Amino acid sequence: MPPSSFPHRADDDSVVTPIVCHPTDIDKWKHLLATVEAVIDTAAADGPEDAVRVFHLVIGVLKTVRPTYAAKLTYVKTSGAWVHGDSRDEIVSDTTPTATPHPFAAWRAVHERHVVGSTLVNGIVVRPVWVIGRSGSHLGNMLFPSAHAGKVVGLGIPGGRWSVIHQDDLADAYLRAVERGSIVGGSTFDIANEFTEGIDDILATLCRLSGAEGFTYREPTNRKRIPNVTTPA
């Protein structure tokens, strides 16, 4: 993301200074690993190649640039709730073994174990559910075009529910994990609101705010993903 994309005040000394590169282009940012307190990995990934590579690149660089007397780096890996599988009647938590992940996310469950099991970093895994809020969600891209056209078209099933978390609350979870990295290293955290949201309610609210004439549901084009984002009432 280019620097101009980050909103900030001219007198704000805490503005984020981005390094524009692919995450695996570690030569652009490996010098920072000698002194930073934490790495928060939020890179999107639909497969293990880049996600696993970034982690192992960081581990390799740490061995050469970080003093042996320095405190361990905290590495926070973003995974997802899909690793819990697609059960409609089992209750899961942070500590539930991921023995039956959804096939789409099976690789994530394996990678999680590498991160939390590392002896070279304080490895922490954060599993957000569907992220909402401003530009931090796919929800707008999915629903707004149809609302603009006059009728909201939703993804899922009538009466279904979404487990969501606002991006500000997710950011707070990252902050708390980093602040307590030396204590909670080796831990995994599911990040979700206490209550799920009814999809019908979300679509009805969008209709009211946009002036669209009602809502409907469309048949999913990728049934491998639909179980990951919806649950029956």
Feature locations, PLM:
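A conserved structural motif in NAD(P)-dependent oxidoreductases
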Residues: 163-170
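Active-site Tyr-X1-5-Lys
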Residues: 99-126
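Conserved sequence/active-site signature of Rossmann-fold short-chain dehydrogenase/reductase
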Residues: 83, 131-133, 170
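NAD(P)H-binding glycine-rich loop region in Rossmannoid oxidoreductase-like domains
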Residues: 12-67
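Conserved Rossmann-fold NAD(P)-dependent oxidoreductase catalytic core, especially the SDR/UDP-sugar
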Residues: 59-106
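NAD(P)-dependent short-chain dehydrogenase/reductase
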Residues: 121-125, 129-162
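SDR active-site strand-loop-helix element
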Residues: 42, 75-81, 126-128
